[in-house]
Curated annotation (Swiss-Prot):
NADP(+) binds at G203, L204, G205, E206, M207, A208. Substrate binds at T58, C59, N60, R61, S121, E126, T127, Q128, Q132. Possesses an unusual extended V-shaped dimeric structure with each monomer consisting of three distinct domains arranged along a curved 'spinal' alpha-helix. The N-terminal catalytic domain specifically recognizes the glutamate moiety of the substrate. The second domain is the NADPH-binding domain, and the third C-terminal domain is responsible for dimerization. Keywords: NADP, Oxidoreductase, Porphyrin biosynthesis. This is Glutamyl-tRNA reductase. Gene3D superfamilies: Glutamyl-tRNA reductase, N-terminal domain, NAD(P)-binding Rossmann-like Domain. One of its GO terms (molecular function) is glutamyl-tRNA reductase activity. During catalysis, the active site Cys acts as a nucleophile attacking the alpha-carbonyl group of tRNA-bound glutamate with the formation of a thioester intermediate between enzyme and glutamate, and the concomitant release of tRNA(Glu). The thioester intermediate is finally reduced by direct hydride transfer from NADPH, to form the product GSA. Pathway: Porphyrin-containing compound metabolism; protoporphyrin-IX biosynthesis; 5-aminolevulinate from L-glutamyl-tRNA(Glu): step 1/2. The keyword Amino-acid biosynthesis does not apply.
Amino acid sequence: MELETHLSKYFTLAFTHKSMSLEMREKLAINSSATLKEFLQTIKNHCPNIKECMVLSTCNRFEIYASLRHGAHANEQKSALLKILAQNKKMSVSDLEKCVLMNTDESAVHHVFSVCSSLDSLVVGETQITGQMKNAYKFAFEEKFCSKDLTRLLHFAFKCAAKVRNLTGISKQGVSISSVAVKEALNIFEKERIKDKKALVIGLGEMAQLVIKHLLNKQFEALILGRNAAKFEDFIKELEEPKKVSFQNIENLNAYINEYELLFCATSSPHFIVQNSMLKETIFRRFWFDLAVPRNIEKPVLDNIFLYSVDDLEPMVKENVGNRQESRTKAYEIVGLATMEFYQWIQSLEVEPLIKDLRELARISAQKELQKALKKRYVPKEYESNIEKILHNAFNTFLHHPTIALKKNAQKEESDVLVGAIKNLFNLDKSNANHAQNLNLYKCEYYEE
């Protein structure tokens, strides 16, 4: 009988701003729950060797995190997933192959921890990615595409990200895509000598809200075009100067699109919100920032409109992160240590229940024999308590060395064979299954002392 490893085989596929153009990232982007669920279901239906799966889709990356079944080959899963992506997104496998980064086992864990800690972001240290990963995990968990393996990985990643933020201060230096866009807008405002510090913001999602807050900090006024007036009312309660922000339904876009010199657009729409058919000639130059993926603004045909995409802002981001190198080095040390601790913890997960089961088996056996002796009056009833203590001390002493040896060997690759052999010898497979059933999958079992 083959013993299945208790260590999960983690696997990641990543398409990021480092390896893939904005045009290609747009094709991969998933912006609706229905589309995401359909995509994950396709993976589940066509990739039987993938146990658990989740997808992270943001403006700068499209990533698949998975755990593989025992004996599955990572390259085979990669090929299968690229075929699914190619068919689903109407792209070629060869184009995807050129841009994809695959990681397995420890390198996959290190990658997930780095992404969650914002070390792989366009803007190093931005905290938005952690929230995006939490949402991606929560969706996959609630839709039953991920379970124990990814729960453990992601919760440990969230702990790692918190440690990176707390110990390095990498998130306190105030650089984000939204802040860089507003900073560039301020530079334009000063160079162009624009009279009114006003901006048009299309959208009311997380990115758009960050833009609005940065604009207000720079003493701008903002008109927001959106679909949800109630959401706007809730949002302005967070603002120190709510009177500087007003709201109109996005259906009125045509009435405002040619009135503002500064425009920021960040919605989850898969189509162009701002189209050339809406544009009119103006005597002033216009500066537009499209912070969405897929892009929300069609490439303008008018010469006096200057459009900045997410990728256009990358050089400006790099100018702002030079002083983060020391924090980044420290952060990678934390991620490396967390990766090692994660695997040590995972390796111990099978040993701890086994030790508990062995002790419980010894206790039950001793109690059973004691009750027999009492029933046959081999020992007086009044000695029962003292005999229980003697038996308890006896099996604790007997199991002391095996317990130490099991914990020590948990760190070795051959621990799977040892654990499996002990389970078979003592018929403990069934009892260990109960531990899995009682596991709270929505809460990681790992707690730091």
